[in-house]
């Protein structure tokens, strides 16, 4: 009996000991899993924080580009309004200058014909009395004074139109530079937005707990990264194309009016002499490279340095003393005014007033200098009313 009791006690002790060992082992395994999970969560949190920093940095870059685009657009709106105002002021000053020139030329011809000194003496000699002589002399003095005031006003207006033309040209150049910067920023923005999307999807993939959702997000991330790479390739191609176009435009400037005229003639044409204007430079850099004004300045160096947009050239040329008209001539500058920026070109061949050829740049998007349209009617183009500026 004692042996059975002892055996039972020993069996119970062994069973309790085994249960205790199993319970302890199970507790240690669960703790290890919890610790491992905690470590995994901790690592994932750190990775998420790093990914969030990347997203924030790219978002700042995107916001900066968008802010710059907004500022550039606002500046362009302001400069275009300023250019429009200056255009009106230049036109008005040009009219005044041309009108005064006509008056001064008439007075000069009259003085040469009648003789100012002889007329002055005759006025005194033919007076019936000293009082009448004094009155006549006073009247002639007033006329001379008025002429002097007219000359001073003419000088002031010419100075004002020169300053406004420079300011207008600066505004136009800035607008064109801003437009190019906006185009560059648009390409950069596309790349940054694609990178942002990839970073956001990367963050979402790291936060995902379900394997199916994570796999889907990883596929989207790979697609977004491929899109970002494609955008970067497109941006590089855009820059390369732009550089190539710029080289073509600059290379097209290695020409002159004689070469352009000969290109459309069956036999070599006689050289066309440009009017020498010492006050103007032969450098076309005062106009944006590739614009129609730059092309004309390259072919016709006698043109002014700060004549504004193509639509403004006729009034600017008239104010500078150049002759303008409606009859095309080889070597003349054709100036179209469509109510906007307008267009200019150099005439290289003439059959009639409705059939000419020209050399130009920035026609139909082609920014190189050349004959881009052959024979055409200059009076029926979409570019507006045509006026010709003559070198002499």
Swiss-Prot record:
Nucleus recorded as keyword: no
Disruption phenotype: Non-viable.
Ranges in coiled-coil conformation: 34-96, 191-227
Region (Interacts with large extracellular loop of FtsX): 47-267
Activity regulation description: Lacks peptidoglycan-hydrolase activity in vitro, probably due to auto-inhibition by the CC domain. In the homodimer, interaction between the CC domain in one monomer and the hydrolase active site in the peptidase C51/CHAP domain in the other monomer probably mediates auto-inhibition of the hydrolase activity.
Membrane topology, from the record: Peripheral membrane protein
Signal peptide positions (record): 1-27
Enzymatic class: hydrolase
One Pfam family it belongs to: CC_PcsB
GO CC annotations, alphabetized: cell septum; extracellular region; plasma membrane
Described function: Peptidoglycan-hydrolase activity. Required in maintaining normal growth and cellular morphology. Involved in splitting of the septum during cell division.
Subunit structure: Homodimer. Interacts (via N-terminal coiled coil domain) with FtsX (via large extracellular loop). This interaction directs PcsB to equatorial and septal sites of dividing cells. Interacts with FtsE.
Protein name, per record: Peptidoglycan hydrolase PcsB
Organism in which the protein naturally occurs: Streptococcus pneumoniae serotype 2 (strain D39 / NCTC 7466)
Lineage: Bacteria, Bacillati, Bacillota, Bacilli, Lactobacillales
Gene: pcsB
């Amino acid at each position: 009996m004692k042996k059975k009791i002892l055996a039972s006690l020993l069996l119970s002790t062994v069973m309790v000991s085994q249960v205790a060992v199993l319970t302890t082992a199970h507790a240690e395994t669960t703790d290890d899993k919890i610790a491992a999970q905690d470590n995994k969560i901790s690592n994932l949190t750190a990775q998420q924080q790093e990914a969030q920093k990347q997203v924030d940095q790219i978002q700042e870059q995107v916001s900066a580009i968008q802010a710059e685009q907004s500022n550039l657009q606002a500046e362009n709106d302001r400069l275009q309004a300023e250019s429009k105002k200056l255009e009106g002021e230049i036109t008005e000053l040009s009219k005044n200058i041309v009108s005064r020139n006509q008056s001064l030329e008439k007075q000069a011809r009259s003085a040469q014909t009648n003789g100012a000194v002889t007329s002055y003496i005759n006025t005194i000699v033919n007076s019936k009395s000293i009082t009448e002589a004094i009155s006549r002399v006073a009247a002639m003095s007033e006329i001379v004074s008025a002429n002097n005031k007219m000359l001073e006003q003419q000088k002031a207006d010419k100075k004002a139109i020169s300053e406004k033309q420079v300011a207008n040209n600066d505004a136009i150049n800035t607008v064109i530079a801003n437009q190019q910067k906006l185009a560059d920023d648009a390409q950069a923005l596309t790349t940054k937005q694609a990178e942002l999307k990839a970073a956001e999807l990367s963050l979402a993939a790291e936060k995902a707990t379900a394997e199916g959702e994570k796999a889907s997000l990883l596929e989207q991330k790979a697609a977004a990264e491929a899109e970002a790479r494609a955008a970067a390739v497109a941006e590089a191609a855009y820059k390369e194309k732009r550089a190539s176009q710029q080289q073509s435009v600059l290379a097209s400037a290695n020409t002159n009016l004689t070469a352009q005229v000969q290109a459309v003639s069956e036999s070599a044409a006689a050289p066309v002499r440009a009017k020498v204007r010492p006050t103007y430079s032969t450098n076309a850099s005062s106009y944006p490279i590739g614009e129609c004004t730059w092309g004309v300045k390259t072919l016709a160096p006698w043109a002014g340095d700060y004549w504004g947009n193509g639509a403004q050239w006729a009034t600017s040329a008239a104010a500078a003393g150049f002759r303008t008209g409606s009859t095309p001539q080889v070597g003349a500058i054709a100036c179209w005014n469509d109510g906007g920026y307008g267009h200019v070109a150099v005439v290289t061949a003439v059959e009639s007033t409705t059939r000419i050829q020209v050399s130009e740049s920035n026609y139909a998007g082609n920014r190189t200098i050349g004959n881009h349209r052959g024979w055409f009617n200059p009076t029926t183009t979409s570019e507006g009313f045509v006026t010709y500026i003559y070198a002499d």
